[in-house]
Amino acid sequence: MAFKARSSRFSVKMVEDTGGSQDLINNSFSSFIEEKSKESKKNKGNVTISDRSSNPFHISRDMDYFLLREQEQNQAIAEREQKKILRVHQKMTYASKVSAKHTSLRRELQLEDEMEQQLLNAEAKEMNCFRENNDWKLAMTRERKREPETLNDYMEKRRSMFLLQYALAMKRNEIQRLEMLATREENRLERAEKFLEKDASLFDEFLRENDRNSVQAMRMAEKETKIKTEKIVEIRELTAQITSIKSEISKFEDTLKHYKIYKEFLYKLSPKEWLDEQQEKHLAFKRAKESSELTRNNSTAILFGDKGSGSKSKTAFLWKEVPGLKKVTKTGRLVKALSSSIQSLPQVGQLTQLSPHSELDSRLSSTMFPSQDDTDSDGEELALYFTEPQQLLDVFTKLEEENLSLIQNTQEMEETLDELNVTLKNTQIRMDKEVNLLKQWIASMMISISKEEESAAELELKARVFHFGEYQGDQQDTMLESLNHKVLEVYRKCVGMQQEANLGTVQMLTVVERQLDELLENLERVPQVKIEQAEKAKERERRMRLREEKAMMQKQLQEERLQRARARAQAKIKKKRGRKLISRSHPPVIKVKEVREQTLINKDKEEMLFFFT
């Protein structure tokens, strides 16, 4: 390309300086063509004589492919490890790598273009200096021979000059266009570089801001975790305090329940007269309190109006609270004494569970005496019947004596109850046995009755059949003998010849029926699978027998057919002579009533029913 540019510029300069000297144009054009042909010959020679190593697509034989692959893998691993060490802002993406490569190549190309441009400028200056030398001009003009020019030569030269000028103009335009494109591309690349620098600066700013935010977030998180741990510690302390308070409350509630149980126990042990007296006192106190409250409410409403309601509630609350404290202190002492007395007498508590007197006291106390909540709400100080532990011990001894007497009575009642149960069981067993015996006797009687009824029905049927009025005595005897022979044959086939001992017809039939019943019972005991197998075998035998009979029948029919065909073949041929006979109408047939046959059929049916059902 550099050589072409130099030659074109040299030819253009010569044309412009000589102002139309044809010799110089011819020489320059011929020299340009000669140089071009030499260059093409050189290139052809290089192509033919070029070494294989100069081919970029040729790989030498002594190169190891696997070694190259391992080197590439090791290089890729080293690059990855190096990327891991780098920071975030130092790492590059694939697009940034490609853009960096393009920029480096672009800079190298720009430097090469600048060097070539400088060389071309230096050569152009040398050529201008050489052309301006007059000695060279004289030498070139003296040595040329003047030949007469023709019009065709002149036209050819002008044509070649025009073509060269046109080619130069086109090349200048193309060079200008390429320069404009290059400047435009350079401007675009500069703008892209500026944008990239701006984006990089913005990204760096974003990373710095992100680092600052992360540091602030870490600090805030540390503060929040510290506050959270402090709150958790406080919550744990408060929960521990709450649990301790709840445990104390549960303990106090348990003691209060125990005190209430003791108090109820003392009220249950107190006598009924004293409970009635306390109930009357309680009702009187309640009425007095209600009347006093009504009078107080009326007086306060008249004097102070609504403002005195708060002071009244406070005074009432204080009036209720003080006797409650007195009551708790007084009951506490009695409860201690009661617990000590109960511990000294553990068996008395067990005996009291059986005494009806304690149940009676509990009912009376629940119905007549108010509960502790009512007394607390009323604010009344309730008195206790027992003031000393000895009173409780006396009550316990009395209850123990009563319980012992009651226990003795219950034991005696249990003994009598056991004796009654034994006698009842014995009588029940005896009655059950008698009932079972009676049921069996009734069942046997019903069976015998049914048998007798069946035998009576059979005898009646026999009498009705044999005394029908149409059979003679000798006919009945022959019929009975034939029936006896048939029954005997069935008996011999079913029972055998060994057990034959001059039995009657009815006896043989009973033996056959009994054996048939036994066989049916045995058949019910046989598994269903074996029965199905036997049925299948019998069905197979029946089918085989039917098939054989059918084959025999077909064979007989075939033989008969063959005999008829043979007879037809051997018979003489009869020639028909005369007219064909025509069948005439037959007279109507007179129907005869078959009364006798119907009676015989009815008799046969009765005999079948009698002998085979």
UniProtKB/Swiss-Prot annotation:
Keywords: Cell projection, Cilium, Coiled coil, Cytoplasm, Cytoskeleton
Residue ranges with Polar residues bias: 45-55
GO BP field: cilium movement; inner dynein arm assembly
GO MF, one example: dynein complex binding
GO terms for cellular component: axonemal doublet microtubule; ciliary basal body; motile cilium
Disordered: annotated span: 36-55
UniProt xrefs under InterPro entries: CFAP_domain-containing, DUF4200
Main location: cytoplasm
Subcellular location: Cytoplasm, Cytoskeleton, Cilium axoneme
Stretches of the chain forming a coiled coil according to its record: 167-198, 233-260, 396-435, 504-580
Family classification: Belongs to the CFAP100 family.
Function, in words: May play a role in ciliary/flagellar motility by regulating the assembly and the activity of axonemal inner dynein arm.
The protein's name in its UniProt record: Cilia- and flagella-associated protein 100
